[in-house]
Swiss-Prot record:
Induction: By iron stress. It is a multi-pass membrane protein. The keyword Transmembrane helix applies. The gene is isiA. GO terms for cellular component: photosystem I; plasma membrane-derived thylakoid membrane. This is Iron stress-induced chlorophyll-binding protein. One of its GO terms (molecular function) is chlorophyll binding. Signal peptide: none annotated. Under iron-starvation forms a complex with PSI trimers, where the trimer is surrounded by a ring composed of 18 IsiA subunits. GO terms for biological process: photosynthetic electron transport chain. Disulfide bonds: none annotated. It comes from Picosynechococcus sp. (strain ATCC 27264 / PCC 7002 / PR-6) (Agmenellum quadruplicatum). It comes from the Bacteria. Its cofactor is chlorophyll a; all-trans-beta-carotene.
């Protein structure tokens, strides 16, 4: 992390993973523990939503954010359109159990594993990294891309072979047996991606994304960063963090818009009607139907949450990018605190 030439910087607990920036073993432990928290939240919140779900009311008008996703995946949808929450309970329980396994892994890396993988033996040593080592950072990036590609292919497998997805056009759960593979169709969505209106194109797009992610993962594992990349990019903990935050911000803004207007990936039956864009102190997405006071559709909750989280991630990206380039924010504080010359 940026220390401004001070080798003895001490980070408090609130600095998060900055405390472990130079301890690759502890860094992995922190990431596994973070994954445990995410999975625990998903499981616990799924069970919480089940506890107040009312099958007599539209799902999109019950302040739900996780059950609509599960329903969109074709889970819990009976032949007559009724919702069976038993699969949701099973999924929530599996997430809770998985979070315990991940938490145990995090504790192992923190308490029993080597603090620095440089001292590890066996395959673990391969994942030691230094922030100034582009080759090793590329290898770690490659493994991340492989996992993301696997996630894309899991959705494809669910759509094509394991029960299918919910199709809002027919209001049924069906297998997607002929996903779109025409590159002209897939890449034709570049300027209007949120207008996609059929499952075949969505699943075909995930096939393309999965192939690109896996190919990119293999490339980065085998091929070190090229010279042009080394010249253009900064390789440091602060810079890598800024790149990650920028990517998450972009994904958040895209997800917010997609959720707000698309009714194929986000069916009206589960998320409520499309939203309007409003402008107050800040931009926001507003419901287009009348609801009781302080009630919002699932679409409104998700779109606005993604938008505002993306906004703050963008601020984090800019903050850490400037620090990575050497800008010292303490200078701003000093200038503001000094009295103006008479």
């Amino acid at each position: 992390m940026q220390t401004y030439d001070n080798p003895d910087v001490k980070y408090e607990w609130w600095a998060g993973n900055a405390r472990f920036a130079d301890l690759s073993g502890q860094f992995i432990g922190a990431h596994v523990a973070h994954a445990a928290l995410i999975v625990f939240w998903a499981g616990a919140f799924t069970l919480f939503e089940i506890s107040y779900f009312d099958p007599t009311l539209p799902m999109g008008e019950q302040n739900l954010i996780l059950l609509p996703h599960l329903a969109t995946l074709g889970l819990g949808i009976e032949g007559n359109g009724a919702i069976n929450t038993e699969p949701y309970f099973v999924i929530g329980a599996i997430h809770l159990i998985s979070s315990a396994v991940l938490a145990a892994g995090g504790l192992f890396h923190v308490l029993r594993g080597p603090q620095d993988l440089k001292t590890a033996t066996g395959p673990a040593r391969r994942f030691h990294f230094d922030w100034e080592d582009p080759k090793q950072l590329g290898l770690i990036l490659g493994h991340h891309l492989l996992l993301l590609g696997l996630g894309a292919f899991l959705l494809v497998a669910k759509a094509m072979y394991f029960g299918g997805l919910y199709d809002t056009a027919t209001q049924t759960v069906r297998l997607v047996t002929e996903p779109t593979l025409d590159p002209a169709v897939i890449y034709g969505y570049q300027t209007h991606f949120a207008t996609v209106d059929n499952l075949e194109d969505i699943v075909g797009g995930h096939i393309y994304v999965g192939v690109l992610l896996v190919a990119g993962g293999i490339w980065h594992i085998l091929v070190p960063p090229l010279q042009w990349a080394k010249k253009v990019l900064l390789f440091s903990g602060e810079a890598i963090l800024s790149y990650s935050l920028g990517a998450i911000a972009l994904a958040g803004f895209v997800a917010a818009y997609f959720c707000a207007v698309n009714t194929t990936a986000y069916p009206v039956e589960f998320y409520g009607p499309v939203l309007d864009v409003k402008l107050s102190i800040v931009p926001y997405f507003a419901d287009t139907i009348e609801l009781p006071m302080n009630e919002h559709t699932s679409r409104a909750w998700l779109a606005n949450a993604h938008f505002f989280f993306a906004f703050f991630f963008l601020q984090g990206h800019l903050w850490h990018a400037l620090r990575a380039m050497g800008f010292d924010f303490r200078r701003v504080e000093k200038v503001l605190s000094d009295p103006l010359d008479a």
